Amino acid sequence: MSKKISLKIGILMDSIESINIKKDSSFAILLEAQKRNHIIHYMEMNDLYLRKEQAFARTRLIKLIKNTQKWYQFIKQQSISLSELDVILMRKDPPFNTEFIYSTYILERAEETGVLIINKPKSLRDCNEKIFTSWFPDLITDTLVTRNIFQIRQFWEKYQDIIIKPLDAMGGANIFRIKKNDPNFSVIVENMTNYERKYCMVQNYLPEIKLGDKRILIINGKPIPWCVARIARIGETRANLAAGGEGKIQSLSETDWKIANYLSPTLKKRGLILVGLDVIGDKLTEINVTSPTCICEIESQKNISITGMLLDYIEKKVCL
């Protein structure tokens, strides 16, 4: 692609004011886009709107600075039709709630005018990060999605050591391990299901978590050869970095490659261009499609530009 061509790149994300620029994948992607002289239009959820059949947003042109004190500067605010953009990066973090779903409808209207949306709005709706794993039964451990407390109790009695988690959260939020004879079983399950009014996911505990909960990144169907093995603190079940876990960079194992290569064609077909797989041992546990992280951790230790791979894809796709 000619260096003279500047794309109009929109990004929809949570407040840039509250990010950690040393670890934030969205910030890393935007830095790469800025380095390539693309024009960045920053948006938050409140900025999106639909007027008749047309998608609009109040955007702010933004300049990024790699400075831990002040890392961004808004240059100009304007209301535009999203059809004026070349690409929109949907990087809004969960919760995956009705507001998130509504935003994908608006983005889909922009997509229908020819704007490239990463990841594809319809697939963001269809591919819940927890439930989507059930489309690949050979890759996952025994998994129950229910809001029925009796079914959860039966599952617990069978395995005697289980993990229960919500379907719409991130970063290890509200994940519980329930061991054999845990006196708190009832109160945990009642709260997780909101007294049988809310679905959750239940899985047997995987002891391989002690070796790390691996985050494997895939760009346009191509697995990154290194992953981040997130290891839980002593006394903690959750290995997520957001929950205090320690991240170690390691090469993909043979099993990791098999899982990633098996999933890649489906992800690519669905327009899921930037994806993070979570793997414990040899089991797939989540398929992160909303705003996958761990780009910075890998790039800081390995001679690879994951953000560069993503921007290469965008430039090639838009300029075909």
Curated annotation (Swiss-Prot):
Gene Ontology MF terms in the entry: ATP binding; glutathione synthase activity; metal ion binding
Family matches, as SUPFAM superfamilies: Glutathione synthetase ATP-binding domain-like, PreATP-grasp domain
Binding-site positions, ATP: 156-212
Entry keyword annotation includes Thylakoid: no
Natural source organism: Buchnera aphidicola subsp. Acyrthosiphon pisum (strain APS) (Acyrthosiphon pisum symbiotic bacterium)
Gene that specifies this protein: gshB
Obligatory cofactor(s): Mg(2+); Mn(2+)
Protein name listed in UniProt: Glutathione synthetase
UniProt-listed Enzyme Commission number(s): 6.3.2.3
Lineage: Bacteria, Pseudomonadati, Pseudomonadota, Gammaproteobacteria, Enterobacterales
S-S bonds: none
